[in-house]
C-alpha cells in the first residue's frame, strides 16, 4: 500500500508538471516520453525496495535459526547439552540404604564409616561378650558427576568430576544430616593422556562385584583412587601415581601414614578384551619411605602383581582378582594390612608380604532381576617382630538380589558375613543385611 501511494503521488507530480512541459515544448510526444521515463524510474525503485525487503527477511530468519556462541541448547538428549563448543553430560544416582549390622565383638559410634560399608580391617575382635546390633538409614552414597568435552586441535579433550557424600567430616544425624560432598574422581583426558584423580591403574574396576551396598568383598580386592599421570597406548597403560606408605611403628601397633616418598608409585598394565569379556595383568613398584623429625629416614622397596577380569558365563558373568606382593599395604583390602613395619631392633623399615583375591558370580534370573554371590580373602605374612595382635587374615562372603522395578530404578537386598583374625587366633565377625533403593540418571 505504501509503495502504491508513492507511485500515485509521483504520477500526480509528473502530471502536474505536464502543462509546463507542454508550454515549453508544445509537443505531445515529449510529454508522453517524460511520463514513460518517470513510470520506468518508479518501477525500478519499487523492484529495489522489494528485493531489499526479501533480503531483510532472510537475514532475520537466519539470525533466529542460528543461536549465538554462548546460547545453551535446550534440546535434551543422551549426548548431553551444549554451551558454546563444549558438550556437557550430567550423571550419577540417588541411593538410599538401610543397614542392619551385628558386630560380634563390639560396635562403632554413630557416624563411623564402618557402619556405612564393609571395611575388613576394622571388624572388632577379642570381646565376644559384647555383641552389638545397629540399624542405619543413609543416603550418603548418592553420587553426582559432570563431564565436559570439546574439540582441541582435531582431538577430543574431556574433563570429568565425580562426588558423593560418604566420609564427610561435616554434618551429623541430630538435626539436618547435612553431609558435605567429597571428591571421588577429577581428571582430564587428551590424546591418550589422563591426569588428575582417578582409580589406580593397578585396579581393574570391571571386576568389582555388583551389590546392593556401596562396596562389598573388599578383603582381597585392589581398591584405590588417587592423583596420577597415566598414558594409554593400545592395550598398554603406564602411570606415575601418588606414593604414600602406611607403616607400623616400632611399638608394634597403630599406623603411621608416612607420606615421605621421594618418588611416585610406578604402575604398568596390560588389558585384553574379547567376546568372552576382559582380562588385565598389572605390576606395581613403590617406595616405602619413613622419615620423621626425630628419626633418620628409612625405606624399603615394595612391589606387587595383580590379575583381574570379568568373563561371561552364560547370560551372566564371573568377576575375579588375584593379587600379591610385598609392601602392597593400602592397595589391597582397604589397607587392612600396612605396607611395612619398623623393626624395633634395627630401626629398618621392612615390607610386609600380603596376598588375596576374590571371585563373584552375577547371574540374571529374569530381564529385570539378577542374583550375585561371592567370596573374598586377604592374608598377611607378618614379620616375627610384630606382636601377635597384628591382623593375620580377613575373609567375607555375600549374596545379593537386585530387581529393576522401573527404568533406572533398582531395589536390592544383600547379606554379608565378614571375619577378621589376629596372629594369636583371636577373631571377630560382622553380619550385615542391606536394603537399597537406587535411581540412576
Feature names for model-found ranges:
Residues 22-109:
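N-terminal periplasmic/intermembrane-space "pro-region" immediately following the signal or transit peptide
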Residues 101, 151, 166-171, 200-204, ...:
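Sequence/structural signature of outer-membrane beta-barrel proteins
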Residues 139, 181, 224, 262-265, ...:
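Membrane-spanning beta-strands of outer-membrane beta-barrel proteins
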Residues 274-391, 395:
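Detector for outer-membrane/organellar transmembrane beta-barrel domains
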Residues 403-405, 428-441:
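Outer-membrane beta-barrel "beta-signal"
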Amino acid at each position: 500500500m505504501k509503495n502504491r501511494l508513492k507511485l500515485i503521488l509521483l504520477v500526480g507530480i509528473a502530471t502536474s508538471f505536464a502543462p509546463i512541459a507542454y508550454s515549453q515544448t508544445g509537443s505531445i510526444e515529449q510529454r508522453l516520453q517524460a511520463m514513460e521515463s518517470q513510470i520506468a524510474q518508479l518501477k525500478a525503485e519499487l523492484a529495489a525496495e522489494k528485493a531489499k525487503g526479501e533480503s531483510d527477511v532472510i537475514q532475520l530468519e537466519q539470525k533466529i535459526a542460528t543461536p549465538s556462541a554462548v546460547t545453551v541448547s535446550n534440546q535434551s538428549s543422551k549426548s548431553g547439552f551444549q554451551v558454546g563448543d563444549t558438550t556437557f553430560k550430567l550423571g550419577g544416582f540417588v541411593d538410599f540404604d538401610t543397614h542392619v549390622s551385628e558386630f560380634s565383638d563390639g560396635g562403632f559410634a554413630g557416624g563411623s564409616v564402618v557402619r556405612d560399608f564393609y571395611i575388613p580391617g576394622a571388624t572388632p575382635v577379642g570381646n565376644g561378650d559384647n555383641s552389638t546390633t545397629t540399624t542405619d538409614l543413609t543416603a550418603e552414597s548418592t553420587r553426582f558427576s559432570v563431564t565436559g568435552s570439546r574439540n582441541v586441535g582435531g582431538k577430543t579433550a574431556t574433563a570429568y568430576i565425580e562426588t558423593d557424600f560418604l566420609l564427610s567430616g561435616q554434618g551429623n544425624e541430630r538435626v539436618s544430616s547435612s553431609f558435605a560432598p567429597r571428591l571421588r574422581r577429577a581428571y582430564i583426558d587428551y590424546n591418550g593422556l589422563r591426569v588428575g584423580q582417578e582409580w589406580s591403574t593397578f585396579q581393574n574396576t570391571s571386576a568389582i562385584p555388583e551389590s546392593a551396598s556401596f562396596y562389598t568383598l573388599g578383603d582381597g580386592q585392589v581398591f584405590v583412587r588417587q592423583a596420577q599421570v597415566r598414558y594409554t597406548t593400545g592395550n598398554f597403560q603406564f602411570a606415575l601415581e601418588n606414593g604414600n606408605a602406611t607403616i607400623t611403628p616400632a611399638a608394634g601397633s597403630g599406623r603411621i601414614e608416612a607420606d615421605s616418598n621421594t618418588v611416585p608409585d610406578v604402575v604398568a598394565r596390560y588389558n585384553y578384551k574379547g567376546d568372552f569379556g576382559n582380562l588385565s595383568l598389572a605390576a606395581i613398584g613403590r617406595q616405602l619411605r619413613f622419615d620423621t623429625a626425630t628419626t633418620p629416614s628409612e625405606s624399603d622397596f615394595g612391589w606387587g602383581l595383580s590379575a583381574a577380569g570379568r568373563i561371561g558365563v552364560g547370560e551372566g558373568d564371573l568377576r575375579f582378582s588375584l593379587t600379591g606382593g610385598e609392601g602392597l599395604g593400602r592397595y589391597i583390602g582397604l589397607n587392612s594390612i600396612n605396607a611395612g613395619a619398623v623393626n624395633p631392633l634395627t630401626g629398618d623399615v621392612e615390607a610386609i608380604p600380603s596376598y588375596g583375591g576374590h571371585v563373584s558370580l552375577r547371574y540374571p534370573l529374569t530381564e529385570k532381576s539378577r542374583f550375585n554371590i561371592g567370596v573374598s580373602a586377604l592374608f598377611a605374612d607378618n614379620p616375627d617382630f610384630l606382636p601377635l595382635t597384628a591382623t593375620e587374615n580377613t575373609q567375607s562372603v555375600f549374596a545379593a538380589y537386585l530387581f529393576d522395578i522401573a527404568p533406572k530404578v533398582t531395589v536390592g537386598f544383600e547379606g554379608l558375613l565378614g571375619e577378621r583374625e589376629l596372629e594369636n587366633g583371636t577373631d571377630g565377625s560382622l553380619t550385615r543385611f542391606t536394603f537399597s533403593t537406587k535411581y540412576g540418571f
